[in-house]
UniProtKB/Swiss-Prot annotation:
It is an enzyme of class 2 (transferase). Its EC number is 2.3.1.-. Transmembrane segments: none annotated. Keywords: Acyltransferase, Transferase. GO terms for molecular function: 3-oxoacyl-[acyl-carrier-protein] synthase activity. The lineage of its organism: Bacteria, Bacillati, Actinomycetota, Actinomycetes, Kitasatosporales. This is Putative polyketide beta-ketoacyl synthase 2. Belongs to the thiolase-like superfamily. Beta-ketoacyl-ACP synthases family.
Length: 414
């Protein structure tokens, strides 16, 4: 009987408030530096949301052809730029692809193309329907990034979009890994968001979990007694997943293995109930990865920044990991960039991958007084040799997801 196919990460591309490219992103994350700042987008000044994680110095025209720019929103610009970075990192060119049907694309998105949509709606109401551009019909849609990435790359394998709230980013990677295990050679997967246009910001005002603080140093402090919610962010990450044997044959480095995943649903803003749902997802993901609780070397927490939600997450870790929950390092680097909705967890996956490679666990910015029974990494990066990382994500609408990464193509624990 042949060994089961395994999906490994061979390429990583990041566009985030910490910067563009994995190296720049990692340097800022490991230093514990915060990229949160007052929102400087035109039209947002009167809104009660004051702080966000904004991608600096992003020039889509320098990274994406004009043909695609006129058809797409900022969230798709992020996705296309991050995809090219990931393909370059994987050293995967068109010449390396045997058939266009051997490459698929899976993304997740929550906010869609709000910036493009707002611009066209303003034309509709200010000038009339004949001034609305034809690309409004596709640019706002959640599937736009998957479609444009596949068209640009000529990828004709299985493509899809995951709609699973903030947990969608992890679920997209799991969906991609499943496609690889079922026979697809390569899948480009990840998530990006651009939720900071005025229209998008107004749509978020109904979330009670959002922080209204106007102080970048106090607006997002998960797992503390002063936690007052989270701040939004833009950006995201894309990955190249390949079948392990095929990656090895072409000389690609297996940076990590997508070892296990599970998802549950516990209802919108039901944070006490999320404890059981998240614990079940953790236990199932570990079982599917062939890991025991004590095999987990680092946890990248969901870290919502809402007291009830943080408490539920800490208790879920205790339920799923037992005594090991008090010993395993836990971190939430997203406190320095904000929560990019569907893309928040894939940025955590990027950080986890880099943490395993650099043997450093980045700290949780803005946090000093941890009020939960966790070994939360704060202040400065912690030297470690993590081989197994657990990444967690929960959505405001009730989705819970857990993903297990193993360093390189290392065999699973016995």
């Amino acid at each position: 009987m042949s060994a089961p196919r395994r999906a490994v990460v061979t390429g990583l591309g990041v566009v985030a408030p910490h910067g563009i490219g994995a190296e720049t992103f990692w340097k800022t994350a490991v230093d514990g530096t915060s990229s949160l700042a007052r929102i400087d987008r035109e039209g947002c000044g009167h809104l009660p949301l004051k702080i966000a994680g904004q991608v600096p110095d992003f020039d889509p025209a320098a990274l994406i052809e004009d043909t695609y720019l006129v058809q797409t929103d900022r969230f798709t610009h992020f996705a296309m730029a991050a995809t090219q970075l990931a393909l370059d990192d994987a050293r995967l060119s068109r010449a390396d692809i045997d058939s266009p049907y051997s490459v698929g694309v899976v993304t997740a998105a929550g906010s869609g193309g709000g910036e493009f949509g707002q611009r066209e709606l303003q034309k509709l109401w200010g000038q009339g329907s004949k001034y609305v551009g034809p690309y409004q019909s596709i640019a706002w849609f959640y599937a736009a990034s998957t479609g444009q990435i596949s068209i640009r790359g000529g990828f004709k394998g299985p493509c899809g979009v995951v709609a699973a709230d903030e947990a969608g980013g992890l679920d997209a990677l799991a969906h991609a890994a499943l496609a690889v295990r079922r026979g697809t050679a390569t899948v480009v997967a990840g998530a990006t968001e651009a939720p900071l246009a005025p229209y998008s910001m107004v749509c978020q005002l109904g979330y009670p979990e959002l922080s209204r603080s106007a102080d970048p140093g106090r607006a997002y402090r998960p797992f503390t007694s002063a936690a007052c919610g989270f701040v939004p962010a833009e950006g995201g990450a894309m990955f190249v997943l390949e079948e392990e044997g095929a990656a090895r044959e072409r000389g690609a480095d297996a940076r990590a293995t997508v070892a296990g995943h599970a998802a549950t649903f516990t209802g919108a803003s039901r944070w006490e109930e999320s404890r059981a749902g998240l614990a079940h997802a953790i236990g199932t993901a570990l079982a599917r990865a062939g890991c025991r609780p004590q095999d987990v070397d680092v946890v990248f927490a969901d870290a919502l920044g809402v007291p009830e939600a943080d408490r539920a997450e800490a208790l879920a870790l205790a339920d799923a990991l037992g005594p090991h929950a008090r010993r395993v390092p836990v971190t939430a680097p997203k406190a320095g960039i904000g929560r990019a909705f569907c893309a928040a967890a894939v940025l955590d996956v990027a950080t986890a991958l880099l943490a395993m490679e650099h043997e450093l666990i980045p700290p949780t910015p803005h946090v000093l007084d941890v009020c939960h029974d966790l070994d939360l990494v704060v202040g400065r990066a912690r030297p470690a040799r993590p081989r197994t990382a657990l990444v967690l994500s929960r959505g405001l609408m009730g989705n819970n997801s857990a993903l297990v990464l193993r360093r390189g193509a290392a065999p699973f624990p016995e």
